[in-house]
């Protein structure tokens, strides 16, 4: 279709697709930020192997978590809900991005800083989960898997891992006005601020 912005053109296709149902056929990924219950089990079964489905509509996702999991055993599913695994929530980003940015007096929050947050979260998800996180969420052994692709919001490691990544990215990208020199001391101060020392 004509008159698409450059941002939308990046995701456009020349394929003849008129419906969400058609778009889901052989798709590897679905990212929904729309309304509840627009994705059906048949849409999920038409997707490629090991599909990634981020059904992020709140309060109810594009497809119910249990229905999706019952439909596809190979699915990697995330929602914005705290009562299901893989809750994607901005609480994992904003406080820690701002903390790192403020601590180096960054003049702006740029793409390098946002990507540093993404990478730090991804790396943290692959690390062994502290017992206190398992207890807080009523779990026995959280570990990187289809049901745990992103850290939990109450993971105390977030404060010591995400802000330093943001601060370092701000410094490396030239937007930090007060660089950090002692990273160990900085991490220790972050832990003390949060009561996790």
What spans do the regions from the language model cover?
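N-terminal Rossmann-like NAD(P) cofactor-binding subdomain of oxidoreductases
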Residues: 12, 33-36, 46-49, 56-63
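A short, aliphatic-rich alpha-helical micro-motif
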Residues: 23-24, 44-47
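Glycine-rich phosphate/diphosphate-binding loop of Rossmann-like nucleotide-binding domains
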Residues: 1-35
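Adenosine-phosphate binding glycine-rich loop
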Residues: 55-163, 167-180
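Long, charged amphipathic helices and adjacent flexible linkers at domain junctions
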Residues: 180-197
């Amino acid at each position: 279709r004509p008159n698409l912005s450059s941002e939308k053109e990046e995701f456009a296709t020349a394929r003849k697709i008129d419906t969400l149902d058609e778009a889901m056929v052989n798709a590897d990924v679905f990212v929904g930020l729309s309304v509840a219950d627009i994705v059906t089990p048949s849409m999920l079964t038409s997707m490629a192997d090991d599909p990634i489905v981020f059904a992020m509509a709140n309060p109810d996702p594009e497809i119910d978590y249990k229905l999706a999991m019952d439909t596809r055993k190979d699915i990697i599913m995330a929602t914005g809900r705290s009562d299901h695994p893989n809750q994607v929530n901005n609480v994992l980003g904003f406080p820690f991005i701002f903390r790192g940015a403020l601590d180096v007096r960054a003049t702006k929050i740029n793409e390098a800083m946002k990507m540093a947050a993404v990478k730090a979260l991804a790396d943290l998800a692959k690390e062994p989960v502290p017992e206190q996180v398992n207890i807080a969420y009523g779990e026995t052994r959280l570990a990187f898997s289809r049901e745990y692709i992103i850290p939990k919001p109450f993971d105390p490691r977030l404060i010591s891992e995400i802000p330093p990544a943001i601060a370092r990215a701000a410094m490396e990208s030239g937007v930090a006005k007060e660089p950090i020199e002692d990273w160990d001391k900085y991490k220790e101060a972050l832990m003390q601020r949060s009561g996790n020392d």
